[in-house]
Structures are given as C-alpha cells and as structure tokens.
Amino acid sequence: MLNILKRNLFLVPLLTCFTGSLAKAQKMDFEEYDPRSTLVVPAHILTRAKYPFIDIHNHQWDMPSQNLSELTTEMDKLNMAIMNNLSGRGYRDVNGYFDVQDTTYFKKAQSNIRAHYPNRFIQFTNISFTHFGQKGWTEHALAELEADVHNGAKGLKIYKDLGMEFKDDQGRRIPVDDPRLDAIWEKCGSLHIPVLIHSADPPSFWDPMDKYNERWLELKTHPDRKRENAHPASWKTIIEEQHHVFRAHRNTVFIAAHFGWLANDLSSLGKLLDECPNVYVEIAAIIAELGRQPRQAKDFFTKYQDRILFGKDSWVPSEYVTYFRVLETADEYFPYHKKYHAFWRMYGLALPDEVLKKVYYKNALRIIPGLDKSSFPQ
C-alpha cells in the first residue's frame, strides 16, 4: 500500500507538468491561429486575367516622375490593359496643407503619361476642399476641374474625407450632399465625365469592438479605423448623404467605390441600382465579401452585369490573383490574401464570359470618355 502511494505521489508532478503544457499549447492569439485546410479540391491559381481588363480604382503616388516602363511590365503580366490613377493631383504639402492644391502635379503626371504610354494610363482629377465655404471657392474649383478635363482628366475622384474629415471655413463637417457642391456634380454631368466617390468605410467600423464584430482583428491592428456615431457621423448618415447626391443629380454618372460598402447587403445595393440608373459600382477591396456568398453574388453579377466595374485599390500585383480566382473559377474554400480583412474562406463565382468581359472592360469603355479600345476583344 505504501509503495502504491509513493508511486502515485511521484506521478502527480508529471501529470501536472503534462496538463500544464497541454493547456499552454491550447492557448494562442487569434492572429496566430491559421489552420491549413485538409480539404482536397481542385485549385486554380490565376496569375493573369482571362481577358484584358481596366483597373478603374488604382493609386500611384509619384506619376509625374514614375518609371512607367516598369509599371507596364507588371501590368502586362496581369493582362491589365489600362490603369486608372485616381490620385491625379497626388497629395502634397502646399503652404502647410497636405491636400490636392498643387495644380502643376496633374499637368506633370499627364506629360509623363503622354510621353511614354498614352494608351495604358488614364487619370481622374481631384478637388481641394481647403477654404471650402469662402467666397469664390466654387468658381475656383469649377475652373480647375474644367482645366484638368481639358488636359486629359477622364473623371473626378472624391476621397472618403468628404463627409468624414473635411471641414468648411467655420470648422463644420462637410456633408457629402452639401448643397454648395451641387455645381460640381452638375459640371461633371455637362462635361460627360464620371464621378468615382468613396463615402464612409465598412459599417463594422462603427459597431462596438467586441467578440461579435467581424472586423475586430482589423480594428485591433489598425485602431485608427474605429469610428463612432458622433465622430464624425454615423455610417447610415454618411451613406444616405451619398445616395441623396445620386438621386439629385441623375444626369451625372457616379461610380460608388467599394460597392458602396453594401457588398454584404446585395439586396439593398440592388434596390439602389434599380432606383438610380446613373450609378455604377466597382469591386475594389470587397472581393472577400463576394467570395463568401458565391451563389447570391453570381446572381447579382448576372442581373447587374452592365453596372459593375473592376477595381483593386492598392497596387500589390500579387493580390490580383484573389480577384481573378473569385471572378473566374469555381474553386472552393480558399483564403483571402489578408487575414485582418477576412478570416473566412471564399468560393469562386465562375462568371460566364460575357459577364466577365463587361466587368473587366466593356462597362468602363462605355462610361469613360476617349479610351483606346484597340486592346480589347469585341
């Protein structure tokens, strides 16, 4: 009996050590947990789009002096025929303001494009909201917009700062539908150029940062993205302001950036498109939302195939693979390229060729003036 007791006492620390190690092994941060799927299914890693495409949503931040030969080499690998630089005026420090006030920036960028690859790059211009509300702001902004269009701008890009960060000369938030901007939207319509407008951010950025928030990891790793209803305004308020602009200016073509942040609510987005035939959407930075609802997303692309454009946003060539795979293949259960954006797995939509052609280039050729169509099939 005594020997048995001694043996058991000897085993206690061993068992304690073992269970302690096991408990430690079972604890890890969410960022660390990255299981490898054991699912054996077909996989198609597409490094090149099936058809030449127009990237309607891209940013290059040094276009006046950038080596465009190097850039086109990377574009050719992807089968990107035309890149649209939305940052036509850059974002430079002018008289103490980081803004788009430098009128020479766009001119120099256009000169670089014309001298080297005039058929491969287009640019949208931007307007400065510095001194907004002061007398003469509207006339000055309209004159600069017309000058840039005369110099080759194919559209106007509005950053998300409108409605969120920009303030007028009295220090008040500038709503997206501020009536003092009506002349800008109307001018774009008369010039026959589209307005690509980014309003708000993903709605989860406004939700409580708790265990129920799908964007918890993104907010943890990027805390500056967290929003509050009173700072600067609620998500619903900003989006409704944007939609009010769409309805009020039906002779102007608008492209809602990032699917209007409604890729997770395609029914609501469909209602908006039905109501506003002047509105288009593009898929930059929301492909993960589409990839987790392949059947509904495919139905949406089929129904609204004439209203969707291809866009990527950040220039990271290796990430285009994800877009091609979601749009073109029927692959199952594959990861997104940034866990903090989407920790879930995705599925391909396997879009038919005619829908792919419209998304990749036909729709952009139709609504953006003066593009070279020679690189695209019929």
Locate each region found by the language model:
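Bacterial N-terminal signal peptides that target proteins for export
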Residues: M1-F10
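An N-terminally biased module of ancient metal coordination in phosphate/nucleic-acid-related enzymes
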Residues: Q26-N119
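Active-site gating loops and adjacent loop-to-helix segments of metal-dependent hydrolytic enzymes
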Residues: E31, K50, K167, P203-N229, ...
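Acidic (Asp/Glu)-rich catalytic clusters
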Residues: H44-R48, L71-N79, K107-R120, A143-A153, ...
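Hydrophobic faces of well-ordered beta-strands that scaffold small-molecule active sites
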Residues: I54-N58, I82-N85, I122-T125, L156-I158, ...
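Acidic-and-aromatic substrate-binding clefts and catalytic sites of carbohydrate-active enzymes
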Residues: H59-L68, G90-Y105, T130-E139, F166, ...
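H/E-rich (His + Asp/Glu) clusters that bind or coordinate divalent metals
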Residues: P64-S65, T72, A230, W235-Q378
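Active-site gating/metal-coordination segments in enzymes
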Residues: V100-R225
